[in-house]
Protein backbone atom coordinates (compact mmCIF):
# COMPACT_ATOMS: atom_id res chain seq x y z
CA UNK A 1 0.00 0.00 0.00
CA UNK A 2 1.35 3.45 -0.91
CA UNK A 3 2.20 5.94 1.81
CA UNK A 4 -0.63 8.37 2.48
CA UNK A 5 0.36 12.01 2.60
CA UNK A 6 -1.19 14.90 4.54
CA UNK A 7 -0.41 18.59 4.07
CA UNK A 8 -1.29 21.24 6.67
CA UNK A 9 -1.12 24.98 5.99
CA UNK A 10 -0.18 27.42 8.77
CA UNK A 11 0.69 31.07 8.33
CA UNK A 12 3.33 30.83 11.07
CA UNK A 13 4.78 27.52 12.21
CA UNK A 14 5.10 26.78 15.01
CA UNK A 15 3.33 29.66 16.73
CA UNK A 16 0.49 28.75 19.10
CA UNK A 17 -2.10 26.18 20.03
CA UNK A 18 -3.27 25.19 16.55
CA UNK A 19 0.31 24.51 15.46
CA UNK A 20 0.99 22.45 18.56
CA UNK A 21 -2.08 20.35 17.80
CA UNK A 22 -0.81 19.82 14.25
CA UNK A 23 2.47 18.49 15.66
CA UNK A 24 0.58 16.09 17.96
CA UNK A 25 -1.46 14.82 15.00
CA UNK A 26 1.71 14.42 12.93
CA UNK A 27 3.40 12.46 15.70
CA UNK A 28 0.50 10.01 15.93
CA UNK A 29 -0.24 9.39 12.25
CA UNK A 30 3.40 9.35 11.13
CA UNK A 31 3.90 6.34 13.41
CA UNK A 32 1.10 4.65 11.48
CA UNK A 33 2.49 5.04 8.01
CA UNK A 34 1.52 8.59 7.04
CA UNK A 35 3.88 11.22 5.67
CA UNK A 36 3.07 14.66 7.09
CA UNK A 37 4.00 18.05 5.63
CA UNK A 38 3.41 21.59 6.83
CA UNK A 39 3.43 24.49 4.37
CA UNK A 40 3.97 27.82 6.13
CA UNK A 41 4.44 31.45 5.20
CA UNK A 42 6.85 31.94 8.12
CA UNK A 43 8.91 29.24 9.83
CA UNK A 44 10.09 29.52 13.45
CA UNK A 45 12.48 27.32 15.39
CA UNK A 46 11.07 24.05 16.69
CA UNK A 47 11.21 20.25 16.71
CA UNK A 48 9.96 18.98 13.35
CA UNK A 49 11.14 15.39 13.67
CA UNK A 50 7.71 13.93 12.84
CA UNK A 51 7.00 16.11 9.81
CA UNK A 52 8.51 18.04 6.92
CA UNK A 53 8.15 21.83 6.98
CA UNK A 54 8.07 23.71 3.69
CA UNK A 55 8.11 27.47 3.22
CA UNK A 56 6.05 29.46 0.77
CA UNK A 57 8.15 31.73 -1.45
CA UNK A 58 8.68 35.24 -0.11
CA UNK A 59 5.83 37.62 -0.92
CA UNK A 60 3.56 34.65 -1.74
CA UNK A 61 0.32 34.90 0.24
CA UNK A 62 -2.44 32.27 0.21
CA UNK A 63 -4.91 35.13 -0.03
CA UNK A 64 -3.52 35.96 -3.49
CA UNK A 65 -3.10 34.09 -6.78
CA UNK A 66 0.65 33.43 -6.46
CA UNK A 67 0.38 31.85 -3.02
CA UNK A 68 -2.68 29.82 -3.97
CA UNK A 69 -0.88 28.44 -7.01
CA UNK A 70 2.10 27.53 -4.82
CA UNK A 71 -0.19 25.46 -2.59
CA UNK A 72 -1.75 23.73 -5.61
CA UNK A 73 1.68 23.02 -7.10
CA UNK A 74 2.90 21.60 -3.77
CA UNK A 75 -0.10 19.28 -3.58
CA UNK A 76 0.60 18.04 -7.12
CA UNK A 77 4.36 17.63 -6.68
CA UNK A 78 4.05 15.69 -3.42
CA UNK A 79 0.94 13.71 -4.42
CA UNK A 80 -0.89 14.90 -1.32
CA UNK A 81 -3.94 12.83 -0.34
CA UNK A 82 -5.41 15.21 2.27
CA UNK A 83 -5.05 18.98 2.62
CA UNK A 84 -5.89 20.39 6.07
CA UNK A 85 -6.58 24.09 6.52
CA UNK A 86 -6.74 25.00 10.23
CA UNK A 87 -8.36 28.21 11.50
CA UNK A 88 -8.22 30.43 8.41
CA UNK A 89 -11.24 30.36 6.11
CA UNK A 90 -9.48 31.15 2.83
CA UNK A 91 -12.27 30.28 0.40
CA UNK A 92 -10.34 31.04 -2.85
CA UNK A 93 -7.62 28.66 -1.64
CA UNK A 94 -10.15 25.91 -0.90
CA UNK A 95 -11.82 26.47 -4.26
CA UNK A 96 -8.53 26.16 -6.12
CA UNK A 97 -7.52 22.98 -4.29
CA UNK A 98 -10.98 21.52 -4.89
CA UNK A 99 -10.98 22.34 -8.60
CA UNK A 100 -7.35 21.68 -9.51
CA UNK A 101 -6.36 18.68 -7.38
CA UNK A 102 -7.67 15.30 -6.27
CA UNK A 103 -6.78 15.97 -2.63
CA UNK A 104 -9.44 15.60 0.04
CA UNK A 105 -10.12 18.83 1.97
CA UNK A 106 -10.42 19.25 5.74
CA UNK A 107 -11.22 22.55 7.45
CA UNK A 108 -10.28 22.53 11.15
CA UNK A 109 -12.08 25.13 13.25
CA UNK A 110 -9.89 25.74 16.30
CA UNK A 111 -12.21 28.34 17.81
CA UNK A 112 -15.86 28.92 18.61
CA UNK A 113 -18.21 28.89 15.58
CA UNK A 114 -18.64 32.39 14.12
CA UNK A 115 -15.67 33.61 16.13
CA UNK A 116 -15.30 36.32 13.51
CA UNK A 117 -18.44 38.04 14.84
CA UNK A 118 -17.15 37.98 18.42
CA UNK A 119 -13.72 39.17 17.32
CA UNK A 120 -15.18 42.16 15.46
CA UNK A 121 -17.57 42.88 18.33
CA UNK A 122 -14.85 43.09 20.98
CA UNK A 123 -12.35 44.84 18.69
CA UNK A 124 -14.89 47.65 18.26
CA UNK A 125 -15.34 47.81 22.02
CA UNK A 126 -11.57 47.99 22.53
CA UNK A 127 -11.26 50.84 20.03
CA UNK A 128 -14.03 52.73 21.80
CA UNK A 129 -12.25 52.56 25.15
CA UNK A 130 -11.64 56.00 26.62
CA UNK A 131 -13.85 57.80 24.08
CA UNK A 132 -17.27 58.70 25.47
CA UNK A 133 -19.03 59.06 22.11
CA UNK A 134 -17.53 55.88 20.63
CA UNK A 135 -18.44 53.98 23.78
CA UNK A 136 -21.98 55.31 23.57
CA UNK A 137 -22.14 54.26 19.92
CA UNK A 138 -20.92 50.77 20.85
CA UNK A 139 -23.65 50.33 23.48
CA UNK A 140 -26.43 51.94 21.44
CA UNK A 141 -25.63 50.49 17.98
CA UNK A 142 -22.94 47.79 17.90
CA UNK A 143 -24.18 45.84 20.91
CA UNK A 144 -27.85 45.50 19.88
CA UNK A 145 -26.97 44.88 16.22
CA UNK A 146 -24.56 42.11 17.18
CA UNK A 147 -26.19 40.44 20.18
CA UNK A 148 -29.90 40.99 19.57
CA UNK A 149 -30.46 41.52 15.85
CA UNK A 150 -27.55 39.32 14.66
CA UNK A 151 -26.86 41.83 11.86
CA UNK A 152 -23.27 40.72 11.41
CA UNK A 153 -23.99 36.99 11.25
CA UNK A 154 -25.15 36.95 7.62
CA UNK A 155 -21.80 37.34 5.76
CA UNK A 156 -20.13 34.92 8.16
CA UNK A 157 -22.96 32.43 7.62
CA UNK A 158 -22.49 32.65 3.85
CA UNK A 159 -18.75 32.05 4.26
CA UNK A 160 -19.15 28.96 6.43
CA UNK A 161 -21.87 27.50 4.21
CA UNK A 162 -19.44 27.85 1.32
CA UNK A 163 -16.66 26.20 3.32
CA UNK A 164 -18.99 23.34 4.26
CA UNK A 165 -19.88 22.80 0.61
CA UNK A 166 -16.24 22.77 -0.51
CA UNK A 167 -14.65 20.50 2.08
CA UNK A 168 -14.86 16.76 2.67
CA UNK A 169 -14.68 17.17 6.45
CA UNK A 170 -15.14 20.09 8.84
CA UNK A 171 -13.82 19.57 12.38
CA UNK A 172 -15.06 21.34 15.52
CA UNK A 173 -13.91 21.07 19.12
CA UNK A 174 -17.00 19.83 20.96
CA UNK A 175 -20.56 18.59 20.37
CA UNK A 176 -22.06 21.93 21.38
CA UNK A 177 -20.03 23.66 18.67
CA UNK A 178 -21.30 21.16 16.10
CA UNK A 179 -24.90 21.83 17.09
CA UNK A 180 -24.33 25.59 17.12
CA UNK A 181 -22.63 25.57 13.72
CA UNK A 182 -25.37 23.47 12.11
CA UNK A 183 -28.04 25.81 13.46
CA UNK A 184 -26.17 28.91 12.30
CA UNK A 185 -25.72 27.63 8.74
CA UNK A 186 -29.26 26.24 8.60
CA UNK A 187 -28.43 22.55 8.37
CA UNK A 188 -30.03 21.19 11.53
CA UNK A 189 -30.97 17.82 10.00
CA UNK A 190 -27.70 16.99 8.27
CA UNK A 191 -24.06 17.75 8.89
CA UNK A 192 -22.38 14.44 8.12
CA UNK A 193 -19.19 16.28 7.19
CA UNK A 194 -18.81 17.79 10.66
CA UNK A 195 -16.54 15.80 13.00
CA UNK A 196 -16.03 16.53 16.69
CA UNK A 197 -12.36 16.28 17.65
CA UNK A 198 -11.07 18.14 20.74
CA UNK A 199 -7.55 19.46 20.90
CA UNK A 200 -4.96 17.18 22.45
CA UNK A 201 -2.98 17.61 25.67
CA UNK A 202 0.20 15.72 26.45
CA UNK A 203 0.44 13.82 29.72
CA UNK A 204 2.81 15.19 32.35
CA UNK A 205 4.75 12.19 33.61
CA UNK A 206 5.81 13.68 36.93
CA UNK A 207 3.23 16.13 38.25
CA UNK A 208 4.39 18.41 41.04
CA UNK A 209 1.57 18.61 43.59
CA UNK A 210 3.67 20.55 46.11
CA UNK A 211 2.64 23.93 44.75
CA UNK A 212 3.51 27.42 45.82
CA UNK A 213 0.79 29.83 46.88
CA UNK A 214 0.73 31.25 43.41
CA UNK A 215 -1.99 32.29 40.98
CA UNK A 216 -1.07 32.12 37.31
CA UNK A 217 -2.10 33.67 34.02
CA UNK A 218 -0.58 32.35 30.79
CA UNK A 219 -1.40 33.91 27.45
CA UNK A 220 -1.40 36.91 25.17
CA UNK A 221 -2.00 40.24 26.87
CA UNK A 222 -4.71 41.73 24.65
CA UNK A 223 -7.79 43.70 25.61
CA UNK A 224 -10.26 42.59 22.94
CA UNK A 225 -10.25 38.91 23.90
CA UNK A 226 -8.12 38.02 26.94
CA UNK A 227 -9.13 40.94 29.21
CA UNK A 228 -6.33 40.45 31.73
CA UNK A 229 -7.39 43.77 33.28
CA UNK A 230 -10.31 41.89 34.84
CA UNK A 231 -7.84 39.65 36.65
CA UNK A 232 -6.02 42.71 37.98
CA UNK A 233 -9.30 44.07 39.37
CA UNK A 234 -10.11 40.66 40.88
CA UNK A 235 -6.70 40.61 42.56
CA UNK A 236 -7.43 44.11 43.86
CA UNK A 237 -10.52 42.69 45.57
CA UNK A 238 -8.77 39.75 47.21
CA UNK A 239 -5.04 40.31 47.72
CA UNK A 240 -5.40 41.55 51.30
CA UNK A 241 -7.51 38.48 52.16
CA UNK A 242 -4.81 36.09 50.94
CA UNK A 243 -1.57 37.74 52.12
CA UNK A 244 0.62 34.68 51.43
CA UNK A 245 -0.35 34.45 47.77
CA UNK A 246 1.08 36.11 44.65
CA UNK A 247 -0.18 36.66 41.11
CA UNK A 248 2.18 35.74 38.25
CA UNK A 249 1.37 36.92 34.72
CA UNK A 250 3.21 35.05 31.95
CA UNK A 251 3.00 36.49 28.45
CA UNK A 252 3.29 39.71 26.53
CA UNK A 253 1.25 41.87 24.19
CA UNK A 254 -0.05 45.33 23.40
CA UNK A 255 -1.89 45.52 26.71
CA UNK A 256 1.06 44.84 28.99
CA UNK A 257 2.01 48.49 29.53
CA UNK A 258 -1.56 49.40 30.50
CA UNK A 259 -1.74 46.44 32.87
CA UNK A 260 1.50 47.44 34.58
CA UNK A 261 0.17 51.00 34.91
CA UNK A 262 -3.08 49.66 36.37
CA UNK A 263 -1.19 47.62 38.97
CA UNK A 264 0.75 50.75 39.95
CA UNK A 265 -2.39 52.90 40.03
CA UNK A 266 -4.16 50.46 42.35
CA UNK A 267 -1.01 50.10 44.51
CA UNK A 268 -1.24 46.32 44.27
CA UNK A 269 1.24 44.05 45.97
CA UNK A 270 2.69 40.69 44.91
CA UNK A 271 2.03 40.98 41.17
CA UNK A 272 4.78 39.61 38.92
CA UNK A 273 5.00 40.29 35.18
CA UNK A 274 7.15 37.37 34.06
CA UNK A 275 7.15 38.23 30.34
CA UNK A 276 6.95 35.89 27.37
CA UNK A 277 8.37 32.37 27.69
CA UNK A 278 8.45 29.66 25.04
CA UNK A 279 8.47 27.00 27.77
CA UNK A 280 5.97 27.67 30.55
CA UNK A 281 6.18 24.31 32.29
CA UNK A 282 8.02 25.64 35.32
CA UNK A 283 5.23 28.13 35.95
CA UNK A 284 2.64 25.35 35.87
CA UNK A 285 4.86 23.29 38.17
CA UNK A 286 4.90 26.10 40.74
CA UNK A 287 1.34 27.43 40.58
CA UNK A 288 -1.77 26.05 42.25
CA UNK A 289 -4.44 27.99 40.33
CA UNK A 290 -4.67 29.20 36.72
CA UNK A 291 -6.93 32.22 36.14
CA UNK A 292 -8.47 33.16 32.79
CA UNK A 293 -10.83 36.13 32.40
CA UNK A 294 -11.41 36.11 28.64
CA UNK A 295 -14.36 37.45 26.68
CA UNK A 296 -14.42 34.24 24.65
CA UNK A 297 -12.29 31.17 24.05
CA UNK A 298 -12.58 28.31 21.57
CA UNK A 299 -10.73 25.54 23.35
CA UNK A 300 -8.17 27.27 25.58
CA UNK A 301 -5.10 25.06 25.75
CA UNK A 302 -3.99 26.94 28.86
CA UNK A 303 -6.87 25.24 30.71
CA UNK A 304 -5.94 21.72 29.61
CA UNK A 305 -2.23 22.43 30.16
CA UNK A 306 -3.09 23.51 33.69
CA UNK A 307 -5.13 20.36 34.31
CA UNK A 308 -2.29 18.15 33.05
CA UNK A 309 0.07 19.84 35.54
CA UNK A 310 -2.31 19.52 38.49
CA UNK A 311 -3.15 23.24 38.41
CA UNK A 312 -6.75 24.18 39.21
CA UNK A 313 -8.25 26.26 36.38
CA UNK A 314 -10.85 28.96 36.97
CA UNK A 315 -12.52 30.86 34.13
CA UNK A 316 -15.69 32.59 33.04
CA UNK A 317 -18.29 30.25 31.54
CA UNK A 318 -18.09 32.21 28.29
CA UNK A 319 -18.26 29.41 25.70
CA UNK A 320 -19.13 25.74 25.38
CA UNK A 321 -15.45 24.89 24.93
CA UNK A 322 -14.53 26.31 28.33
CA UNK A 323 -17.54 24.53 29.85
CA UNK A 324 -16.56 21.22 28.27
CA UNK A 325 -13.10 21.39 29.85
CA UNK A 326 -14.05 22.61 33.35
CA UNK A 327 -17.50 21.13 33.99
CA UNK A 328 -18.83 20.21 36.40
CA UNK A 329 -17.72 23.28 38.31
CA UNK A 330 -16.00 22.47 41.56
CA UNK A 331 -14.84 19.11 40.17
CA UNK A 332 -12.66 19.74 37.11
CA UNK A 333 -12.12 23.43 37.75
CA UNK A 334 -14.22 26.46 38.62
CA UNK A 335 -16.73 28.06 36.23
CA UNK A 336 -17.86 31.63 36.90
CA UNK A 337 -20.98 33.24 35.37
CA UNK A 338 -19.82 35.84 32.80
CA UNK A 339 -18.57 38.41 33.66
CA UNK A 340 -19.04 38.93 37.39
CA UNK A 341 -15.79 40.07 39.00
CA UNK A 342 -17.46 39.95 42.42
CA UNK A 343 -18.45 36.30 41.99
CA UNK A 344 -15.04 35.40 40.57
CA UNK A 345 -13.27 37.00 43.53
CA UNK A 346 -15.57 35.27 46.03
CA UNK A 347 -15.11 31.82 44.46
CA UNK A 348 -11.36 32.31 44.21
CA UNK A 349 -10.93 33.28 47.87
CA UNK A 350 -13.13 30.37 48.96
CA UNK A 351 -10.93 28.00 46.97
CA UNK A 352 -7.63 29.40 48.24
CA UNK A 353 -8.79 29.12 51.84
CA UNK A 354 -9.77 25.45 51.45
CA UNK A 355 -6.61 23.30 51.00
CA UNK A 356 -8.52 20.01 51.15
CA UNK A 357 -10.82 21.11 48.33
CA UNK A 358 -7.78 22.14 46.32
CA UNK A 359 -6.20 18.72 46.74
CA UNK A 360 -9.42 17.03 45.64
CA UNK A 361 -9.74 19.15 42.49
CA UNK A 362 -6.05 18.66 41.67
CA UNK A 363 -6.56 14.89 41.48
CA UNK A 364 -9.66 15.34 39.32
CA UNK A 365 -8.07 17.69 36.80
CA UNK A 366 -5.12 15.38 36.19
CA UNK A 367 -7.56 12.59 35.32
CA UNK A 368 -9.61 14.94 33.13
CA UNK A 369 -6.51 15.87 31.13
CA UNK A 370 -5.95 12.19 30.32
CA UNK A 371 -9.14 12.23 28.23
CA UNK A 372 -7.40 14.62 25.80
CA UNK A 373 -4.19 12.61 25.43
CA UNK A 374 -2.49 12.75 22.00
CA UNK A 375 -3.11 9.02 21.70
CA UNK A 376 -6.88 9.33 22.15
CA UNK A 377 -7.19 12.44 19.98
CA UNK A 378 -4.75 11.07 17.42
CA UNK A 379 -6.99 8.03 16.95
CA UNK A 380 -9.85 10.33 15.99
CA UNK A 381 -7.76 12.13 13.36
CA UNK A 382 -6.38 8.84 12.06
CA UNK A 383 -9.90 7.41 11.72
CA UNK A 384 -11.02 10.55 9.85
CA UNK A 385 -8.09 10.43 7.44
CA UNK A 386 -8.57 6.70 6.83
CA UNK A 387 -12.25 7.25 6.04
CA UNK A 388 -11.46 10.08 3.62
CA UNK A 389 -8.84 7.99 1.81
CA UNK A 390 -11.02 4.89 1.41
Which positions does each model-derived feature cover?
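A short, well-ordered alpha-helix in the C-terminal region of glycosyltransferases
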Residues: 283, 343, 357-371, 379-383
Amino acid sequence: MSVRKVLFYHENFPAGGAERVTMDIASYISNRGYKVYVLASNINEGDYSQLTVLKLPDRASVTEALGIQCVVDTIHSLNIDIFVLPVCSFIPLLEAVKQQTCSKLVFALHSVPFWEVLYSFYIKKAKARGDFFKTLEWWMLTYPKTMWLKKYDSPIRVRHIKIYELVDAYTVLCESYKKDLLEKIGMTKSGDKICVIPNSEKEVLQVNLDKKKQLLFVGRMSYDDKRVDRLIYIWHRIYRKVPDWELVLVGDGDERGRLEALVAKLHLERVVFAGYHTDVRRFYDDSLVLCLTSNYEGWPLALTEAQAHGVIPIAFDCTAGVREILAPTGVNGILIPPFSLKRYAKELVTLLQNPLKCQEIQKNVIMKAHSYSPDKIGKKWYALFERLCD
